[in-house]
């Protein structure tokens, strides 16, 4: 005689106590029963009898607080959450009273869900889903959504989903409770057919007529078994628990990010307005980063370009001891110092300067206040400043203290409005007529915002005699022949002047050091702008987290459905994190586009803008990481939901 196989389900003194109120509620009280492979069992009882709680424990949706539950000889209490998810996915198929279909998924997509978590390839899933729907008379409605189906049709879809992974046990909780009598009879006929195929069917109901369709009836009252109609001869099976016959080994969502992305897209499309609001915060944050960095980089390059336009091989000598800001009245530099510097090796051009600011120049009733600068003919070469019209004064003019002048563009336009070329015209400086012999090309502003074109250049000797008086210099500019030797040239000038003066009463700076200093300052300002913009991205990330937390609350039942069909906590974590990352990724791309557009618009108003690939890439990566970080907390909350609690959510 063959050995009797062990029961598929064995309960010994099973208890379930809920401590949610002041008085503990004992939903199940020392329930003991066995169910063998292939049985059709109806568990009947009135509301509050504990039948639904028993079904949740049988289907591994809930855990007992006492007693023993063996499934195929295995103590279920010894299984970890991943193993329990495997049982829900492969061993049990759930048919719920309220159908529990995902509203945003079609009939076929609802049916294939357990196979998604089983790691089956998409074409196999769809093929089996359509085959099951055809078998249940729903083939023509495989693309319909739940709200387009009747109650009976939705329950058929639910049964097809339960069969997707070819489970050993069908758990049907009040499957006819929400159906009309005709649809109810059809559903019961389907359950009977599944039993005939050899599956174990456990039917939960409060209706005696429905229970009569089963081969065995177990009645519960106040959490206890009060009736058991008997036990048919066991059938037995050598099918292992936890994997559908012929199915793929469980790969999990972690190995199928594409599936998680598809689910995320479906969920996000289900509430376009909320998704758009979530996107908006990220878009604005990324756009702010891209725009501000483009403006900051543009401003930096504008300033650096202005310094470079002066030349990176210039040495600027000013009177006054180092560490003390020049006052403009220091008299430590003289023309003879300039002559001595010009004799040093490696000097391409040397130009002493005697400035007088706020001088009024006049022409035919037009008064204009400007700066008059007395200098040498080498000034144009030292400053690398070409002529627009006319010529620069020469050594003869310098020797004769000639009343001749070269105008900057700003002075020329204000003193000679409407005249393209004022060369040959006269204007007055302190009632002394000066002849315009040339006009410089436009130079623009200095790095510090001073208009370089607002200047009148005259011979140094003329400035001493007719404008400023005295014989001292405001500054001295020296251009070296080779920029690589600028440090050596600076040291030579410092040694020369210290030897001539007997002390260090001057300051020497080179434009290269100035360039480096300004570049550091501008980099700091650019980073500051970027940091301010990143704050808006941070705010957008907090918005993503808030919306995702709301989404988890609203979709608690969906999470319960996914857990009931075999999703692991890691699958739920991946899905909701993927949704957050998808939102931030799309928002990041849109933000980069908006930021580039905004920067171009700003450039139309004259602000300097410079695009580099770095800021958009960094901004997008920050948006992506924002989704990852701020989406984790809501995703973790979703992943930690209890299946039975999630399923009971409204």
Curated annotation (Swiss-Prot):
Main location: membrane
Organism: Rhodospirillum rubrum (strain ATCC 11170 / ATH 1.1.1 / DSM 467 / LMG 4362 / NCIMB 8255 / S1)
Bilayer-spanning residue ranges: 276-296, 525-545, 580-600, 615-635
EC annotation from Swiss-Prot or TrEMBL: 7.6.2.-
Keywords, alphabetical: Antibiotic resistance, ATP-binding, Cell inner membrane, Cell membrane, Membrane, Nucleotide-binding, Translocase, Transmembrane, Transmembrane helix, Transport
Signal peptide: none
Membrane topology value: Multi-pass membrane protein
Class of this enzyme: translocase
InterPro entries associated with the record: AAA+_ATPase (IPR003593), ABC3_permease_C (IPR003838), ABC_transporter-like_ATP-bd (IPR003439), ABC_transporter-like_CS (IPR017871), MacB-like_ATP-bd (IPR017911), MacB_PCD (IPR025857), Macrolide_Exporter_MacB (IPR050250), P-loop_NTPase (IPR027417)
Location of the ABC transporter domain: 9-248
Pfam family, one: FtsX
GO molecular function, one term: transmembrane transporter activity
Subunit structure as annotated in this protein's UniProt entry: Homodimer.
Protein name as annotated: Macrolide export ATP-binding/permease protein MacB
Location in the cell: Cell inner membrane
Family: Belongs to the ABC transporter superfamily. Macrolide exporter (TC 3.A.1.122) family.
Domain of life: Bacteria
GO (cellular component) term, any one: plasma membrane
Single GO biological process annotation from the record: response to antibiotic
Functional description taken from the UniProt entry: Non-canonical ABC transporter that contains transmembrane domains (TMD), which form a pore in the inner membrane, and an ATP-binding domain (NBD), which is responsible for energy generation. Confers resistance against macrolides.
Binding site for ATP: 45-52
Organism taxonomic ancestry: Bacteria, Pseudomonadati, Pseudomonadota, Alphaproteobacteria, Rhodospirillales
């Amino acid at each position: 005689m063959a050995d009797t196989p062990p029961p598929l389900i064995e309960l010994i003194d099973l208890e379930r106590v809920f401590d949610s109120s002041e008085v503990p509620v004992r939903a199940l009280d020392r329930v003991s029963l066995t169910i063998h492979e292939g049985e059709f069992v109806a568990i009947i009882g009135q509301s509050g009898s504990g039948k639904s709680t028993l079904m949740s424990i049988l289907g591994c949706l809930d855990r007992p607080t006492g007693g023993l539950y063996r499934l195929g000889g295995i103590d279920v209490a010894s299984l970890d959450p991943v193993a329990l998810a495997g049982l829900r996915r492969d061993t049990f198929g759930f048919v719920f009273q309220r159908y529990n279909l995902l509203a945003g998924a079609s009939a076929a997509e609802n049916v294939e869900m357990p196979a998604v978590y089983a790691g089956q390839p998409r074409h196999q899933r769809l093929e089996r889903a359509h085959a099951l729907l055809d078998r249940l008379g729903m083939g023509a409605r495989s693309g319909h959504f739940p709200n387009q189906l009747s109650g009976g049709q939705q329950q058929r879809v639910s049964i097809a989903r339960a069969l997707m992974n070819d489970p050993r046990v069908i758990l049907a909780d009040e499957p006819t409770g929400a159906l009309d009598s005709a649809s109810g009879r059809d559903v019961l006929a389907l359950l009977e057919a599944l039993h005939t195929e050899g599956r174990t069917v456990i039917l939960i109901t409060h209706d005696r007529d429905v229970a009569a369709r089963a081969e065995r009836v177990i009645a519960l009252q106040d959490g206890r078994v009060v009736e058991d109609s008997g036990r048919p001869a066991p059938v037995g099976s050598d099918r292992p628990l936890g994997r559908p016959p012929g199915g793929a080994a469980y790969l999990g969502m972690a190995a199928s990010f594409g599936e998680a992305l598809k689910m995320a897209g479906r969920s996000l499309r289900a509430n376009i307005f909320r998704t758009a609001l979530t996107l908006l915060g990220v878009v604005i944050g990324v756009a702010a980063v891209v725009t501000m960095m483009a403006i900051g980089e543009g401003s930096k390059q504008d300033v650096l370009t202005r310094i470079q336009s002066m030349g990176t091989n210039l040495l600027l000598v000013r009177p006054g001891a180092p560490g003390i800001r020049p006052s403009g009245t220091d008299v430590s530099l003289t023309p003879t110092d300039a002559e001595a510097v010009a004799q040093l090796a490696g000097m391409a051009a040397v130009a002493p300067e005697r400035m007088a600011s706020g001088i009024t120049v006049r022409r035919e009733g037009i008064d204009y206040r400007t700066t008059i600068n007395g200098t040498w003919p080498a000034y144009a070469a030292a400053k690398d400043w070409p002529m627009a019209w006319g010529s620069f004064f020469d050594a003869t003019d310098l020797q004769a203290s000639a009343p001749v002048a070269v105008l900057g563009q700003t002075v020329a336009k204000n003193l000679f409005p409407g005249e393209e070329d004022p060369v040959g015209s006269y204007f007055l400086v302190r009632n002394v007529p000066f002849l315009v012999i040339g006009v410089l090309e436009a130079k623009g502003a200095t790095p510090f915002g001073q208009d370089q074109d607002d200047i009148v250049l005259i011979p140094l000797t003329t400035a001493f005699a007719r404008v400023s008086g005295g014989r001292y210099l405001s500054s001295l500019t020296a251009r070296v022949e080779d920029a690589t030797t600028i440090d050596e040239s600076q040291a030579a000038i410092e040694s020369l002047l210290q030897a001539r003066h007997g002390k260090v009463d001057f300051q020497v700076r080179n434009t290269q050091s100035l360039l480096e200093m300004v570049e550091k300052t501008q980099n700091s300002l650019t980073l500051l702008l970027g940091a301010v913009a990143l704050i808006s991205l941070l705010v957008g990330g907090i918005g993503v987290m808030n919306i995702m937390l709301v989404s988890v609350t609203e979709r608690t039942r969906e999470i319960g459905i996914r857990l009931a069909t075999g999703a692991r906590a890691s699958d739920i974590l991946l899905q909701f994190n993927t949704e957050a990352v998808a939102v931030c990724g799309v928002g990041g791309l849109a933000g980069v586009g908006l930021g580039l557009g905004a920067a171009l618009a700003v450039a139309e108003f004259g602000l300097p803008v410079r695009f580099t690939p770095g800021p958009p890439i960094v901004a997008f990566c920050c948006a992506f990481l924002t989704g990852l970080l701020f989406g984790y907390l809501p995703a973790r909350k979703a992943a930690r939901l209890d299946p039975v609690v999630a399923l009971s959510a409204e």
